[in-house]
């Protein structure tokens, strides 16, 4: 169906999030993903310091890259499947095995990071707004996202699925971010 407010294509019937993400189901990570995380972390490290929130980092790929940065005090990772991967908290990496909720944030972050999360959000305008409200002026939000319409045009028809529930486009991303 097409959304009447933002005009994007989206799935009509959504699986409740607590059922969809009850168990981890993306267990393999290939070379492309590992390179993506390393490159994204290298980019982020040019700007970041202080306290960081990462949303959706179950395997801690980004957090492990970022923890090497001496300018970062802490990285709090929110994901519902952190512990099933055997992750352990460290002095710098804190684990919150839950869906991100602005009310559960203990201290103002200097940066919020989410890689390939935005396409999973059921109410992205509202959730991005809540994330941005946690940030002070001069803070950062780092996002990496697939562009679903371009993937589908390139023949990747699996880009829209039970987890990627709406057609992320560059224009829609711009509109979402400007609404914050």
Question: Language model features by range: what are they?
Answer:
Residues 174-180:
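Substrate-binding/catalytic lobe of Class I Rossmann-like enzymes that use SAM or dcSAM, i.e.
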Residues 141-166, 170-174:
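Short, glycine-/aromatic-enriched active-site segment of Class I SAM-dependent methyltransferases
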Residues 1-111, 115, 125-128:
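Conserved N-terminal segment of class I S-adenosyl-L-methionine
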């Amino acid at each position: 169906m097409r959304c009447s407010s933002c005009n994007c294509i989206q799935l009509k019937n959504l699986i409740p999030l607590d059922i969809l993400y009850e168990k981890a189901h993306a267990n393999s990570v290939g070379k492309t993903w590992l390179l993506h995380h390393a490159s994204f972390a290298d980019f982020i490290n040019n700007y970041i310091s202080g306290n960081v929130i990462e949303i959706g980092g179950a395997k801690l790929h980004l957090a492990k890259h970022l923890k090497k940065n001496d300018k970062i005090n802490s990285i709090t990772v929110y994901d519902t499947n952190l512990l099933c991967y055997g992750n352990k908290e460290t002095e710098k990496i804190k684990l919150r095995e839950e869906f991100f909720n602005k009310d559960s944030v203990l201290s103002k972050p200097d940066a919020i990071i989410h890689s390939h999360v935005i396409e999973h959000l059921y109410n992205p305008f509202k959730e991005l707004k809540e994330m941005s409200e946690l940030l002070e002026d001069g803070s950062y939000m780092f996002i990496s996202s697939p562009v679903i319409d371009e993937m589908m045009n390139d023949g990747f028809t699996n880009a829209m699925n039970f987890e990627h529930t709406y057609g992320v486009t560059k224009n829609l991303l711009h509109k979402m971010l400007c609404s914050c």
